[in-house]
Each structure stands twice: as structure tokens, then as C-alpha cells.
């Protein structure tokens, strides 16, 4: 039996923020990346929502901490909004989710992603960091009521962010497709997400803004997919490494994905289906899987992303020093529960050795 549920209303296209008027907000709290403090977007959102009062929280940082979420929660409890809007990347959306969740207050929650990667606008996940460890918070109450995918927000994305976020989409889609919780519907969404990234991400990276909405939508589809099916070892290790070294999450996924695919060879028939669906060919499963892995490596190179932790600026000596902590954090990460092969310490150490690189 397959159960599929998505409560989030998704509005997509140019000028989509006008949909805020549906909410009839009176007291609007905006949780946003600091960048937006210097723009007119907060006031535009207030106008679009016809809100009487606006409060802002611009203190979001990459890898939001438990302490930051607690500070934001106090703002929710003090201001008592009827509507909370999260604007920004995955960190802003995750921080806002935690603020709403821990405040215990009933609000309308809207997510407006300004990057194309995390899919947090449609997931029941939020990632908070404490003492160098990333902790996934998973609860259906974290699902936004509305997600707004506005093409106008994508025009000025920096190339590095397009690249990092694009590999986050790929990791979400690939891992959800082979996850133990996957079903026909989640796999269809994941497969379309993979194909869209291979088809459009290089163009977006090269500066073609007309295709960016399609990549944006792919991130949302992959987010819905993994919210239903779960993720896997790539994300477990990415969380562990990110907590230690503060490398962008998508960049870590780009480094890890090919090695994790090898470790998950028991899922090769599913990887092969993905490869064929993305137009990568391969009549035999082994050929299709190789084509998919090589396509990931080629795309990583085309987007100027590192292939090892060493290339990402982390010396092998630092990795060796933190290995035990990384392995423990990865194996205790909830994402391991839906990996197609139950990960063990030997597997994680082997992958870590593969991706460390030469100093």
C-alpha cells in the first residue's frame, strides 16, 4: 500500500507573490536571509498580503543553530503573527519552521524559496545545528501551508549558489528514488526532477534566466518526493560533514553522490531506471548506472564544483582527526533509516576515505 500526502498549496510563475493576498493576513512576520533587509521585498510582501503590521527577523545564518531558532521563537511569541513568511534559501525556511513549531502558536505559514535546491518549501524536515552536529527535525507540522515559486527572485542568483543548490536537487531526487520508502508517485516526481536538472541546470549556470523556473520547480518536486520516501546515506554523511566543516550542503552532496552510488549497488536497477528516464541510455543496468555516475561527475566538473574534500578546502589531516565523530554522526542520522542498504561503519569510513582527497 502506498500513501502519498502533500498539504502545501504550490503557486508558481512570474509575480506569484501576489497569491499572498489570499491569506488575508493582518500581522505578518517575515523570516528572511539578511540580504533581503536591503531590498524593497519586505514591503512588497506586506503590500501583497494586505497586512496591517509587519515584523522582520533577518538574523538567519547558514546552518541555523538551536540557539538561533530559540531567539526567533521568542519573536513569534512576542509579536503573535497570524501569518509567517519564510524568504530565502533552506536555512531561512528551516529556521522559520523551527520558530513556528516551537512557538506552539497557530499561524499560516508560507515559504518563498529564493534558491533552487533545498525543497524545504514542501517538506516536513528542518535541520538545526547544535555543537557542530546537524539534527534533522521531522514532523508533519513543519509542512508549509503555501509555497510560492516566483521566477523574479531567480534572476540574480550567483553561479556558485546555482551549482551548489543544483546538486542538492540531484541528491534529493536520486536518494528519494532508491529509498526504502519510495513509491510510484514519489519516484515519478524524483525522476522528472533528475531529468530537469540535467536538461536545464547547465543553461541556468551559464546565465539563461528563462530556464531557472524549471530548475526551481524541479527542486520542489524533489522535495515532495523525499518528504514521502525518505533520503539516504549521502545526506547522512553530508549532514555530518557539514556540521564539522561548514561546507555548503549541496557542494558536499556533489562530492559524495558518486561514491554513495557505488556503496548502494544493490539499488542499481533503480539507478538504471533513473538514467534511462534522464535520457542517459544504457540497455543493460550496469551500463545505465555507469552512465548516470559519469553524468554526475561531468556535471560536477562543468559547474566548477570540487570532487574531494581537499579541493573544497579541508585538509586530509582535519578529516582524519574528525573521522570518528563524522562516522558516528552519519550512522545516527535519521536519513540512514531509508537508505536502500543498511550502512555500517566500514562503508562510511570507506566513502570518507574516497572523498577525502590528497592534501
Question: How would you name each of these model-derived features?
Answer:
Residues 1-83, 309-310:
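ATP/NTP phosphate-donor binding region
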Residues 318-359:
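Short, amphipathic C-terminal "tail helix"
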Residues 67-153:
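Glycine/threonine-rich beta-strand-loop-alpha-helix active-site module
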Residues 14, 20, 38-41, 66, ...:
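Short glycine/serine/threonine-rich phosphate/pyrophosphate-binding segments
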Residues 117, 220-253, 333-338:
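Glycine-rich phosphate/pyrophosphate-binding beta-alpha loops
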Residues 123-229:
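Carboxylate- and glycine-rich phosphate/diphosphate-binding segment that chelates Mg2+/Mn2+
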Residues 244-321, 358:
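Gly/Pro-rich interdomain helix-loop hinge
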Amino acid at each position: 500500500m502506498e500513501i502519498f500526502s502533500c498539504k502545501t498549496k504550490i503557486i508558481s510563475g512570474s509575480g506569484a507573490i501576489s497569491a499572498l493576498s489570499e491569506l488575508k493576513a493582518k500581522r505578518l512576520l517575515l523570516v528572511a536571509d539578511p540580504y533581503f533587509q536591503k531590498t524593497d521585498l519586505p514591503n512588497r510582501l506586506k503590500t501583497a498580503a494586505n497586512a496591517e503590521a509587519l515584523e522582520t527577523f533577518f538574523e538567519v545564518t547558514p546552518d541555523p543553530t538551536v540557539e538561533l531558532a530559540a531567539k526567533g521563537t521568542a519573536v513569534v511569541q512576542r509579536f503573535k503573527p497570524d501569518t509567517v513568511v519564510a524568504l530565502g534559501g533552506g536555512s531561512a525556511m528551516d529556521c522559520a519552521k523551527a520558530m513556528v513549531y516551537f512557538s506552539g502558536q497557530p499561524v499560516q505559514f508560507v515559504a518563498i524559496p529564493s534558491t533552487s535546491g533545498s525543497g524545504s518549501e514542501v517538506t516536513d524536515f528542518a535541520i538545526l545545528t547544535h555543537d557542530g552536529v546537524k539534527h534533522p527535525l521531522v514532523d508533519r507540522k513543519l509542512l508549509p501551508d503555501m509555497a510560492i515559486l516566483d521566477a523574479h527572485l531567480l534572476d540574480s542568483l550567483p553561479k556558485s549558489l546555482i551549482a551548489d543548490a543544483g546538486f542538492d536537487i540531484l541528491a534529493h531526487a536520486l536518494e528519494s528514488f532508491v529509498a526504502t520508502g519510495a513509491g510510484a508517485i514519489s519516484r515519478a516526481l524524483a525522476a522528472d526532477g533528475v531529468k530537469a536538472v540535467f536538461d536545464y541546470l547547465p543553461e541556468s549556470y551559464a546565465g539563461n534566466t528563462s530556464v531557472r523556473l524549471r530548475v526551481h520547480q524541479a527542486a520542489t518536486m524533489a522535495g515532495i518526493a523525499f518528504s514521502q520516501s525518505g533520503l539516504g546515506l549521502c545526506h547522512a554523511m553530508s549532514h555530518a560533514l557539514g556540521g564539522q566543516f561548514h561546507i555548503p550542503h549541496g557542494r558536499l552532496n556533489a562530492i559524495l553522490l558518486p561514491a554513495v552510488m557505488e556503496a548502494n549497488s544493490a539499488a542499481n536497477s533503480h539507478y538504471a531506471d533513473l538514467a534511462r528516464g534522464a535520457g542517459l541510455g544504457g540497455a543493460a543496468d550496469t551500463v545505465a548506472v555507469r552512465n548516470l555516475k559519469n553524468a554526475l561527475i561531468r556535471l560536477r566538473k562543468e559547474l566548477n564544483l570540487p570532487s574531494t574534500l581537499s579541493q573544497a578546502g579541508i585538509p586530509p589531516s582535519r578529516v582524519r582527526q574528525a573521522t570518528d565523530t563524522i562516522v558516528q554522526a552519519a550512522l545516527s542520522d535519521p536519513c540512514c533509516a531509508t537508505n536502500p542498504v543498511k550502512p555500517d561503519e566500514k562503508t562510511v569510513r570507506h566513502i570518507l576515505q574516497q572523498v577525502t582527497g590528497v592534501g
